[in-house]
């Protein structure tokens, strides 16, 4: 099942009845260097917003914190930094986490176009289910 809209391709591989034990790989690819990969237990496939799977939020929050406070040499708080800091705080809850991360990505690309060139924003995160 592939949904294509503006700058995002959402690929979703749903488990078949034959492969109930198979993990589901959801890949969200945003235009630019943003790539998020995560594996989710099939039981959480019916409502992915409630169960965040094994997607580690601390790594995402730490990544954005480093991106805006360590990789940027201009320590003056601009409007962009304040807005992104507010969005980082707002995605701390597990509910609708994936949607909030996408909103954060789109807001970054909306407020500045040179952010991709100035900082290394390659983000690839793959988590395996802990048995």
Swiss-Prot record:
Tagged with keyword Plastid: yes
Keyword field contains Plastid: yes
Gene Ontology, cellular component aspect: chloroplast
Compartmental location: Plastid, Chloroplast
Keywords: Chloroplast, Plastid
Protein name per the record: Uncharacterized 15.7 kDa protein in ycf4-trnK intergenic region
């Amino acid at each position: 099942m592939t949904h294509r809209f503006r700058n995002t391709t959402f690929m979703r591989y749903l488990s078949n009845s034959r492969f109930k034990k198979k993990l589901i790989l959801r890949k969200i690819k945003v235009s630019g260097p943003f790539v998020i990969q995560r594996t989710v237990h099939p039981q959480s496939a019916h409502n992915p917003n409630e169960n965040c799977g094994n997607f580690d939020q601390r790594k995402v929050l730490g990544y954005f914190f480093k991106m805006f406070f360590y990789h940027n040499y201009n320590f003056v708080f601009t409007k962009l930094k304040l807005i992104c800091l507010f969005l980082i705080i707002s995605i701390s809850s597990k509910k609708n986490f994936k949607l909030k991360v996408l909103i954060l990505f789109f807001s970054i690309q909306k407020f500045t176009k040179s952010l991709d060139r100035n900082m290394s924003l390659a983000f690839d995160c793959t988590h395996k289910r802990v048995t």
